[in-house]
């Protein structure tokens, strides 16, 4: 297929070519992969031309930038496993101008097979993010990659993660680093530090995380007895502007709504009510779970533990201490039945817990619901052959194209993570979708479901909004 880049893709390609270390904050559907591959293709051609003619007719060097003295290859692409398995290799085969690029995926291989692939000569090597520590140890000081592409830069948002600590040791040896993400701030501005550090070594936001925090943040939730800081907030409204300005020279941000003519996206919150008996049972269990928490010192960890139980209750079943599934209600199952009966198209259901999946499959067994796992499952969905598809949002992230199979999403249980939520919805609502997408969200009134909607819609720091919502639930229960 002949590649005719849109103007926004030309902008992205030029930005990569003109910035040795950069990040593209591009919404889903704007073509991050093909833009990056095209930039690498252009850079390689430019390198070959200048190597053949190092001196221009006026006697000056054709190599105006240090990085241009090197080929962009070998290039390492680090991506989520599903993306690493097929997306980059498929993209090269899709476009005529890229077909000569030698791209190999080492994702999902045994260590022995992975070593074999990495010892072979290729232009681009693609690995899954989970093996980054192994990869760094494997190469040691002999890091061979001229370019590193971080295809989901936000996967490196945690400075305490093994993947960040490992890559930090070697990434300065690469001449070019390209970060790609549509969600650079999944939980707020604190998440930005380690992502930018991999690009500039701390030049813009500070050499250490501590320095970054002291400059731009103040403690929010603190245990004053121990001095432990549980969460932070921006020091002032100006802090956001200062951070944005500091990284603006190496970060390009583009929103799909500004560049794509997309069909409408409709969010439909379906509010459900428990009958009095079930509501009483829910509130009793809610109180039981909350009473186990140190309400004077609520942490994100303790809040998350209780909220998981409360989310199970809202969905209709809970796991007992022995691991058995205890049925509570079928309010969401009944609502889902109504949606299925009235829908003419195929439906993609995002579930939250294993018992959600089991109950949905049992309730709709006559429709033979399918979990989207294998390549064949994805093909059958996109061919329109699956009426009811189920997927966990963590399995429906970056690089999964499902827009051909349908235009209806049902959230049986919403996630807390905005990143998961946006990425999952973007499996159907992306470039190539020809119909308006409707996202049904099953929300049980007076439960933690309401808190989830509030957090996802909040413009506050995600962690802060999460804790605020939980504290309000505690106060309303005790």
Residues of each region from the PLM?
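Conserved Helicase C-terminal RecA-like lobe
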Residues: 1, 18, 31, 35-47, ...
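Conserved pre-motif I regulatory segment
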Residues: 1-25
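Conserved P-loop NTPase motor "coupling/switch" region that bridges the ATPase
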Residues: 67, 72-74, 120, 147, ...
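Conserved Walker A/P-loop ATP-binding site and its immediately adjacent core
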Residues: 72-94, 186-191, 353
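Conserved helix-turn-beta segment of the N-terminal RecA-like "Helicase ATP-binding" lobe
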Residues: 83-109, 199-202
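Conserved helix/coil segment N-terminal to the catalytic DExD/H
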Residues: 110-145
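SF2 helicase motor core recognition
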Residues: 133-137, 187-189, 356-359, 378-382, ...
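A conserved SF2-helicase RecA2
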Residues: 416-478
């Amino acid at each position: 297929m002949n590649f005719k880049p849109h103007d926004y893709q030309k902008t992205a390609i030029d930005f990569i070519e003109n910035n040795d270390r950069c990040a593209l904050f591009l919404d889903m559907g704007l073509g991050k992969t093909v833009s990056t591959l095209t930039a690498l293709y252009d850079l390689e051609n430019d390198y070959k031309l200048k190597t053949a003619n190092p001196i221009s007719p006026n006697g000056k060097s054709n190599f105006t930038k240090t990085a241009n003295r090197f080929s962009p290859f070998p290039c390492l692409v680090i991506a989520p496993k599903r993306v690493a398995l097929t997306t980059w290799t498929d993209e090269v085969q899709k476009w005529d101008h890229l077909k000569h690029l030698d791209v190999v995926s080492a994702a999902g291989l045994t260590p022995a097979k992975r070593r074999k692939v990495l010892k072979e000569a290729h232009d681009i090597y693609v690995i899954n993010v989970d093996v980054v520590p192994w990869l760094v140890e494997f190469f040691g000081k002999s890091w061979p990659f001229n370019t590193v592409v971080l295809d989901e830069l936000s996967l490196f948002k945690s400075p305490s993660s093994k993947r960040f600590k490992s890559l930090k040791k070697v990434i300065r040896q690469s001449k070019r680093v390209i970060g790609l993400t549509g969600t650079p701030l999944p939980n707020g501005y604190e998440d930005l530090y380690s992502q930018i550090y991999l690009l500039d070594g701390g030049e813009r936001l500070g050499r250490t995380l501590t320095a970054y925090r002291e400059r731009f943040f103040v403690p929010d939730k603190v245990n004053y007895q121990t001095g432990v800081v549980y969460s932070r907030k921006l020091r002032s409204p100006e802090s956001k502007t200062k951070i944005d300005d500091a990284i603006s020279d190496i970060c390009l941000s583009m929103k799909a709504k500004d560049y794509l003519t997309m069909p409408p996206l409709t969010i439909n919150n379906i509010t459900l009510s428990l009958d009095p008996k079930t509501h009483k049972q829910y509130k009793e269990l809610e109180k039981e779970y909350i009473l186990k928490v140190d309400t004077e010192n609520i942490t994100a960890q303790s809040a998350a533990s209780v909220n998981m139980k409360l989310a199970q209750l809202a969905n209709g079943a809970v796991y007992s201490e022995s691991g058995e599934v205890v049925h509570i209600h079928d309010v969401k199952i009944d609502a889902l039945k109504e949606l299925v009966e009235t829908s003419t198209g195929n439906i993609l259901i995002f579930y939250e817990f294993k018992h959600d999946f089991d109950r949905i499959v049992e309730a709709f067994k006559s429709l033979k619901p399918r979990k989207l796992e294998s390549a064949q499952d994805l093909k059958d969905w996109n061919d329109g052959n699956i009426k009811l598809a189920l997927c966990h949002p963590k399995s429906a992230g970056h690089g999964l194209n499902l827009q051909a199979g349908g235009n209806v999403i049902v959230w049986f249980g919403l996630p807390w993570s905005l990143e998961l939520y946006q990425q999952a919805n973007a499996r159907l609502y992306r470039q190539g979708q020809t119909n308006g997408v409707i996202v049904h969200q099953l929300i049980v009134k007076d439960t933690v479901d309401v808190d989830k909607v509030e957090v996802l819609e909040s413009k506050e720091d995600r962690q802060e909004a999460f804790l605020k919502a939980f504290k309000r639930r505690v106060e309303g229960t005790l």
